[in-house]
């Protein structure tokens, strides 16, 4: 099965979480990603477009950080916002803000012979007051509920807590039920 993305970090996370089930190949590709407010709609539209070029089963994933005090910003624009202002910029926007509630969402679209299946994971949490730990993207500033560590401080343990881990577990259940080797 193929994971199509321009983000190798995502591939590494999925490969780690699915390695006992499938041989996941990475197709590094930039693809049409329409701008919009609905992450699910974005990923389904992108998967339909990619299915014109990729003939074997593949999946893509899109995610976003939604901060309550910022009316859901950066949301589906998370990648762009991270590239432009990074973690420090988001923390600057949150300076003096007491409500630090946020959630991360991950939406996977699996494209195969019978169509497209969608799997969503969502994790509630808070925005840290400073950058903590490593990782990539917003990992060093997002603290999932049930932890006192940021994603960046969790290392590989992040998979148990993360939005991507949650959507991947749903994909995994589907592949186990359907049979990943029998996808048309």
UniProtKB/Swiss-Prot annotation:
* Database matches in Pfam families: Ham1p_like
Q: Identify the EC number(s).
A: 3.6.1.66
Q: Name the residues annotated as catalytic in the UniProt entry.
A: 62
A molecular-function term among this protein's GO annotations: XTP diphosphatase activity
Note on how the cofactor is bound: Binds 1 Mg(2+) ion per subunit.
Question: According to its UniProt record, which reaction does this protein catalyse?
Answer: XTP + H2O = XMP + diphosphate + H(+); dITP + H2O = dIMP + diphosphate + H(+); ITP + H2O = IMP + diphosphate + H(+)
Positions binding substrate in this chain are 5-10, 63, 136-139, 158, 163-164
The record's Gene Ontology cellular component field reads:
cytoplasm
Give the signal peptide as a residue range, or say none if absent. none
> Which Gene3D superfamilies does this entry report, sorted A to Z?
3.90.950.10
Protein origin, superkingdom: Archaea
Q: Supply the alphabetized keyword list.
A: Hydrolase, Magnesium, Metal-binding, Nucleotide metabolism, Nucleotide-binding
**Cofactor(s) annotated in UniProt:** Mg(2+)
Q: Is the keyword Repeat assigned to this protein?
A: no
Q: Where does Mg(2+) bind?
A: 33, 62
**Gene Ontology BP terms:** nucleoside triphosphate catabolic process; nucleotide metabolic process; purine nucleoside triphosphate catabolic process
Relate the assembly described in the record: Homodimer.
Q: What does this protein do?
A: Pyrophosphatase that catalyzes the hydrolysis of nucleoside triphosphates to their monophosphate derivatives, with a high preference for the non-canonical purine nucleotides XTP (xanthosine triphosphate), dITP (deoxyinosine triphosphate) and ITP. Seems to function as a house-cleaning enzyme that removes non-canonical purine nucleotides from the nucleotide pool, thus preventing their incorporation into DNA/RNA and avoiding chromosomal lesions.
Q: Could you tell me which NCBIfam families the record lists for this protein? A: RdgB/HAM1 family non-canonical purine NTP pyrophosphatase (TIGR00042)
| Family in the record | Belongs to the HAM1 NTPase family.
Q: What is this protein called?
A: dITP/XTP pyrophosphatase
Annotated organism of origin: Korarchaeum cryptofilum (strain OPF8)
């Amino acid at each position: 099965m193929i994971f199509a993305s321009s983000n190798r970090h995502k591939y590494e996370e999925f490969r780690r979480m699915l390695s006992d089930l499938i041989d996941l190949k990475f197709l590094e590709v930039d693809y049409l990603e329409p701008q919009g407010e609905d992450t699910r709609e974005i990923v389904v539209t992108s998967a339909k477009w990619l299915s014109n070029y990729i003939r074997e089963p593949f999946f893509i994933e899109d995610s976003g950080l939604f901060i309550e005090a910022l009316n859901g910003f950066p949301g589906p624009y998370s990648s762009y916002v991270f590239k432009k202002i990074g973690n420090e910029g988001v923390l600057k926007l949150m300076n003096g803000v007491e409500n630090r509630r946020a959630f991360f969402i991950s939406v996977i679209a699996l494209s195969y012979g019978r169509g497209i299946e969608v799997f969503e994971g969502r994790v509630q949490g808070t925005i840290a007051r400073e950058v903590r730990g490593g990782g990539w993207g917003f990992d060093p500033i997002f603290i999932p509920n049930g932890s006192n560590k940021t994603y960046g401080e969790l290392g590989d343990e992040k998979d148990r807590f993360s939005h991507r881990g949650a959507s991947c577990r749903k994909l995994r259940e589907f592949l186990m039920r359907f049979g990943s080797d029998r996808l048309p």
